[in-house]
């Protein structure tokens, strides 16, 4: 099943579709979904014995400054299957830099039609402090044992920054 036809969202940038690549709390394996075939490929076994604190995926038809689609973290009560698509609402963004340049991670919560559990989270300040600390900790350390790779977390930004990241990346992909 090709994922090329999955739209970026229902109403950008407030209502997005996230293609999940890595389930929350899963084994330390980095998966990537092939957009043409829909197949889930093993990208690598992570050297650091860590797991993603949230489901991890991307917004289709977007192009971030690192040359990949917009990365998105989706907290949910249960891990999501790789290759699944979930309707979400962005609430913040973790600004980062790695060996390839800028590498922002949008945080988006499930749309209220999927779960009412996240309706109170409207902006980055509403995300539980422990979850933000876990996300920051993960990204500061998940590449530590990989030669030539590094990450610098630059900090958290609000919902407007997350929406801007999505819109700019969507426009970049359309103009490519």
Curated annotation (Swiss-Prot):
Enzyme Commission (EC) number: 3.6.1.1
Entry's Gene Ontology molecular function annotations: inorganic diphosphate phosphatase activity; magnesium ion binding
Keywords of the record: Cytoplasm, Hydrolase, Magnesium, Metal-binding
Enzyme kind, highest EC tier: hydrolase
Names of required cofactors: Mg(2+)
Family per record: Belongs to the PPase family.
Subunit structure: Homohexamer.
HAMAP family per record: Inorganic_PPase (MF_00209)
Protein name per Swiss-Prot or TrEMBL: Inorganic pyrophosphatase
Gene (UniProt): ppa
